[in-house]
Amino acid sequence: MSNKVHLGHTARKRFGQNFLTDGNVINRIVGAIAPDNDHVMVEIGPGLGALTEPVANGIDKLTVVELDKDLVERLKEHPTLKHKLDIHQGDALKFDFSQLVEEGRQMKVFGNLPYNISTPLMFHLFEFAEQIENMHFMLQKEVVLRLSASPGTKAYGRLTVMAQYHCQVMPVLEVPPHSFTPAPKVDSAVVRLVPYKTKPWPCKDVDQLRHLTTTAFNMRRKTLRNNLKHMISDEEFAALGIDATLRPEQITVQQYVAMANLVIDKK
């Protein structure tokens, strides 16, 4: 049998499917998620139910968002899950997660995410950060390193700044390729993201922060002065106490917010 087949389902490359099969890893992830009935529990990409089943066992209802129609049909017919699942068939990148929030209950979101959409999906979920208690995701290890990176490191970039603006980021565990079917060509890791109730450095317009960080990191080897010359003058850099000769990966989240707020105030 092909190593891409698991429980009778053939993994689809276009959906980035790698199914988690290691029971020990599954138990550790479920322990980190800590399922409960006090939150709206939401799984993105439930696949063949490796996390879905143990999470649903301890709660009354689980909401899932799945793109693959074949997998949706399997979930609808699942003997123990079908009565507990609220299934949304569709693309998580376009899904309005705010519709899942119930009065007085925030979301806990989790999933073994398709690696080909993990970065854009992070940016999409940050839009709903105020309605989310926490998130636990299996990601490519490289992406977890980027999410949790410190200024001055190679992994530090636009994703780092936006993730750490919205959330506390905590790596949970590393997961080797043999924990999946089919085995991915990269190492994986689980990360916990906890959105701030009160942001340490509030930005007056998050879209401006996103635009500024994108512009700054477009040319990583160039200086801030070079990359942001159409947005911030040398005098303004000096007023903020920011060295304009530094490269974008040397600037803290707090400093990026300060620059974005300055640009907003000039409008």
Curated annotation (Swiss-Prot):
Its EC number is 2.1.1.182. It is found in: Cytoplasm. It comes from the Bacteria. InterPro entries: KsgA/Erm, rRNA_Ade_diMease-like_C, rRNA_Ade_Mease_Trfase_CS, rRNA_Ade_methylase_Trfase_N, rRNA_adenine_dimethylase, SAM-dependent_MTases_sf. Keywords: Cytoplasm, Methyltransferase, RNA-binding, rRNA processing, S-adenosyl-L-methionine, Transferase. Gene3D superfamilies: Ribosomal RNA adenine dimethylase-like, domain 2, Vaccinia Virus protein VP39. GO terms for molecular function: 16S rRNA (adenine(1518)-N(6)/adenine(1519)-N(6))-dimethyltransferase activity; RNA binding. It holds the Pfam family RrnaAD. It catalyses: adenosine(1518)/adenosine(1519) in 16S rRNA + 4 S-adenosyl-L-methionine = N(6)-dimethyladenosine(1518)/N(6)-dimethyladenosine(1519) in 16S rRNA + 4 S-adenosyl-L-homocysteine + 4 H(+). Its main location: cytoplasm. SUPFAM superfamilies: S-adenosyl-L-methionine-dependent methyltransferases (SSF53335). S-adenosyl-L-methionine binds at residues 18, 20, 45, 66, 91, 112. GO terms for cellular component: cytosol. HAMAP family: 16SrRNA_methyltr_A. Specifically dimethylates two adjacent adenosines (A1518 and A1519) in the loop of a conserved hairpin near the 3'-end of 16S rRNA in the 30S particle. May play a critical role in biogenesis of 30S subunits. NCBIfam families: ksgA. Belongs to the class I-like SAM-binding methyltransferase superfamily. rRNA adenine N(6)-methyltransferase family. RsmA subfamily. This is Ribosomal RNA small subunit methyltransferase A.
